[in-house]
Amino acid sequence: MTGQILKDRHALVTGAGTGIGAAIATACAKAGARVSLAGRRRDPLAALQGKLGSAQTQVLTDFDVTDEEKVRAGIALARREFGPIDVLVNNAGEAPSAPFAKTDLATFNKALAVNVIGAFLVTREVVPDMIAKHAGRVINIASTAGLIGYAYVSAYVAAKHGVIGLTRALAIEFARSGITVNAVCPGFTETPLLDRAVDNIIAKTKRSRDDARATLAATNPQGRLVTPEEVADAVLWLASPGAHSITGQAIVVAGGEVMAG
């Protein structure tokens, strides 16, 4: 998708420093948006801003989506620099891996807090901007794990199902407010998160890195891993004027994985 389809719009992307978040922020900037890069670590955010330029982007560090006051302060700063928020991408996530019997409460709660509570807090703070304009896009980065089950990631699966539930509820609630709310559900994607999953497979099975990657790629009927840019393209489409009638949907970017299952 090309052209300045987001010109003069303000997009806020959480978890923007690396992986899918960085690809989404880059796509929004190339589409003409002013982009607030939100995250907890300054270095990757600053590096991305260096690539995209400071005129079109701002960095929101210490943006902990589970902390109500930090969310409120970060969004206030975003507004002061770039004005009301038109497009929100809730990308920040947490994906712990462990057998269910060894998953402690703290781990389970953290997955819910980052994935579900984070999307709730940030969306609640941003939505008044959209209601005032009678226009806005909320795009939640979920996962195929929000639609089907996977072993050894029960906390993540439960959390991503929650994200899709929140998406569907808000889509109905805001249907007459000019706001669309959708989820994008990537399959296994070439990101630092995937690298950690590969490391975990290697540690537990002693298999080679190539074999571990092949195992993850095999879940995709196309026989490959998804790229962050492919996920970003789906987000950009949902943020575009042409997607005004698309709301409450979970768009799968996984080469047919969920359909095949």
Give residue ranges: language-model regions.
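Short C-terminal tail/terminal secondary-structure segment
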Residues: T2, I148, L236, T247-G261
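Conserved glycine-rich cofactor-binding loop
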Residues: G17-T18
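Substrate-binding pocket helix/loop in short-chain dehydrogenase/reductase
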Residues: P99-F100, T107-L112, L216
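Active-site helix of classical SDR
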Residues: T123, A159, T167
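Alpha-helical segment proximal to the catalytic Tyr-Lys
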Residues: P128, I172-E173, H244
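Residue(s) in the substrate-gating loop at a strand-loop-helix junction
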Residues: S143
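Short, small/polar-rich loop/turn modules that mediate ligand/substrate recognition or access, typified
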Residues: A175, T180, I246-G248
